[in-house]
């Protein structure tokens, strides 16, 4: 993969700093997605959402003199359930005018079905018999999740960023 410079802003987003309060004369676009949206392998200026802002800035019929602001909420390995939770818990407070979901058919379908996904320790949508949708959070009670969520597990995860051997153990 590429070697993009990664900077995370104070809100935990791979993006420049954005004020929560939207300026009066702006069109705010929120991007949700997985690794394609987070785009860790390229520099910020090379991401599709950074270029989207530049392209829309040159399209006066779209913005009619308003400032275009694009905010990236993409996180690698997120499925649609996690993207929905991000929308609900983080995105709405920024008051976006437009929300774009970056969807990649190569893995986003399997990432959203528990028995197809290799990522077992995340929330999934459940389609109930009464035709309602709920969120399966059973992973919170699993032993592997509890271990990795503990202080020692978090230390292990941080150390594994610097050790191929620890990364191998993490995958097992």
Regions found by a protein language model. Give the residues of each.
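A conserved hydrophobic secondary-structure block that centers on an alpha-helix together
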Residues: 53-92
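Membrane/wall-proximal cationic-aromatic binding patches
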Residues: 1-63
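Conserved beta-strand elements of the Class I
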Residues: 28-32, 71, 99
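Proline-aspartate-enriched helix->loop->beta-strand connector
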Residues: 91-100
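Short, solvent-exposed loop/turn and secondary-structure capping segments
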Residues: 40-44, 82-84, 110-118
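Serine-dependent acyl-ester chemistry module
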Residues: 105-172
